[in-house]
A protein has these predicted regions:
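Extended, subdomain-level signal for the structured scaffold at the beginning of enzyme domains
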Residues: 1-130
């Protein structure tokens, strides 16, 4: 089977795009390797896991925890289960640093996205990944 590289930023990646893809690739028998800027596990966009902050009133400190629309917009239950399983996987817990990645070592590349520029910017603008 193929060896697939999934580079992710330190934070704010979309948990559904990463975890569901990871789950499908593993289920199909592929080997998955993660890579992050410094070789430490990344953190998904918490807003997409909890739904907090996705409602119209999400910017109001006292109301942030009240989710209505946010519950519909967050990652669904299956994606959250896949994310929880991915967090326990050795490949996710011990990623390569981006500078350690060698193109010849991999058969495929998956570039997942995210919603918030604050964490995704380093990933999108990385000269190493380009």
């Amino acid at each position: 089977m193929a060896k697939i590289l999934i580079p992710i930023p330190r934070r704010d990646f979309d948990p559904t795009e990463v975890a569901v893809s990871f789950s499908v690739l593993k289920r199909l028998g592929h080997s998955v390797v993660f890579a992050t800027p410094e070789g430490r596990p990344g953190q998904a966009d918490d807003m997409m896991l909890t739904g907090q902050g996705l409602d119209f009133w999400g910017f109001v400190p006292g109301l942030r925890r009240l989710t209505a629309i946010g519950r519909l917009m967050r990652a669904n239950a299956a994606a959250r289960r896949d994310y929880a399983a991915m967090l326990q996987d050795a490949a996710f817990q011990a990623p390569l640093a981006w500078r350690q990645v060698r193109r010849a070592d991999f058969d495929g590349l998956l570039l997942p996205g995210g919603h918030r520029a604050r964490g995704m910017r380093e990933y999108l603008e990385s000269v190493v990944l380009q």
